[in-house]
Amino acid sequence: GVGGVDSYDLDSTTDNRGSKGACHLYNKFSMSAPPNMFVAEYASRPPLARIFYEDVLMAAVFYGYPLLIENNKYGIVRYFESRGYEEYVMGRPEHLKSPNAASNTKTRGIPSNSVDVIQAHAQAIEAYVEEHVGINENTGEMGNMYFDRTLDDWIGYKIDNRTKYDLTISSGLALLGAQKFKQKKKESAFNDKTFFRRYKEEIRR
């Protein structure tokens, strides 16, 4: 499985906006656990940001799931690093990396202000709702989505004003983290004419 986190850096005593931190944990396809479903939802704004960080860390360790975190707010990543749990923070997924960005391999997490990421995030949620919420019209299967707060957040979500939709951000990040990267196969340059040496038969008289 994998998780997604919409974090914050300022303690509630210094930030009166009321935006919460949020975390979702998600089961990817598996033969041993319920697949393609969210298994945990957490949204809170403790008085100190580090309390939120510790709550998220404990959830990640309990489930054993790595987390895809917004790196625009880097405090939670530093907290994981200081506690020795940096391996629980995912890097930017391969399919969302910018070809020429030097920061791709250095910074953990994913930026939330990239147009490509914002579009991919919205499309991931849209695809999940279509395939795994309610009855799938193509397969007839019933999806399992047990978190009403997240469903309500998805309904009200506005892609051009994402600030207050904490549950949508974290759930979408979990879905992005669960996506598989399909690498294009390189065309083989194999040439049997050069691989196998051919000898001309000498005709002796």
What label would you give each PLM region?
Residues 89-134:
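Short alpha-helix plus adjacent loop in nuclease-associated cores
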Residues 1-92, 131-205:
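RNase H-like, metal-dependent nuclease domains and their acidic two-metal-ion catalytic environment used
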